[in-house]
Regions:
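Membrane-embedded alpha-helical segments of integral membrane proteins
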Residues: 102-145
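Boundary regions of SH3-family modules and the immediately adjacent low-complexity/disordered segments
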Residues: 69, 143-200, 209, 221-239
Length: 239
């Protein structure tokens, strides 16, 4: 019986170690400079944790070390959308974008205002707006029935309007079809095909807005330059 218990505990310990092995191996590979091997394990982990910003962050780190600034920026951006207050994610995203001549903060926008606008994730802001809505409804009912709490009801109403306006602007940004140049260079053509002349070329890491698609081509706008044209789908990574 004693041997049986020892065997059971040994198997449980082995199972626990085995379950932790993939991420431990990924971290070890990364420390050893085996970034491609670490990337494979992190991407495997992403299948079971699709909304984990730190998995995207680690994937971005691997691509960054491998010199793929476009794919690094795409994954840092995915992490940033989920965890906008994380300093490491924000700094690495800014670094990856700057390597391609881009900036996280749009021209003319004060950095403090940009940081405040993105201080909550989209889901957090949505939750805040819904909570304020229900609180307002409850207080409004109390005021209608008992004529009490008018001042706090008005305060919550103002907060609700501000939150709703903030959410509306964030919703527009969230639903924007954003992409990043993943290839070393992407040619912007006047039409969806190699038979159309290239009007410009854009280095990896530049942010794009996808407007339309046809066959294996996307119609895009290069956000920082205002250039519009068609680019091969294989040259960009949608965020």
């Amino acid at each position: 019986m004693k041997r049986l218990f020892i065997l059971i505990f040994a198997l449980l310990g082995f199972t626990s170690v085995f379950a932790q092995t993939p991420l431990q191996n990924a971290e070890e590979y990364y420390r050893q400079g085996k970034f491609s091997a670490a990337l494979g394990l992190y991407e495997y982990d992403l299948k079971s944790h699709p909304n984990d910003p730190y998995v995207y962050y680690n994937i971005g780190n691997c691509y960054f070390k491998m010199g793929s600034m476009g794919l690094a920026a795409a994954n840092y951006y995915r992490a940033f959308k989920l965890a906008p207050r994380n300093t490491d994610i924000r700094n690495n995203l800014s670094l990856a974008l700057s390597a391609g001549g881009e900036s996280l903060v749009p021209a003319g926008v004060p950095p403090v205002l940009h940081k405040a606008f993105l201080s909550l994730s989209y889901s957090e802001l949505k939750g805040l707006t819904m909570v304020l809505w229900w609180v307002f409804c409850l207080l409004a009912c109390v005021w209608v029935l008992k004529r009490r709490g008018g001042r706090i009801t008005a305060t919550v109403a103002i907060l609700l309007l501000l939150s709703a306006g903030w959410f509306y602007m964030r919703h527009k940004a969230e639903t924007e079809a954003l992409a990043v140049v993943a290839a070393p260079v992407a040619e912007i053509r006047s039409g969806p095909g190699t038979n159309f002349p290239a009007s410009a070329s854009v280095a990896q890491g530049h942010l794009l807005t996808v407007q339309d698609e046809k066959d294996s081509w996307y119609e895009v706008i290069v956000k920082s330059q205002g250039i519009k044209g068609w680019v091969d789908k294989n040259a960009i990574e949608q965020i």
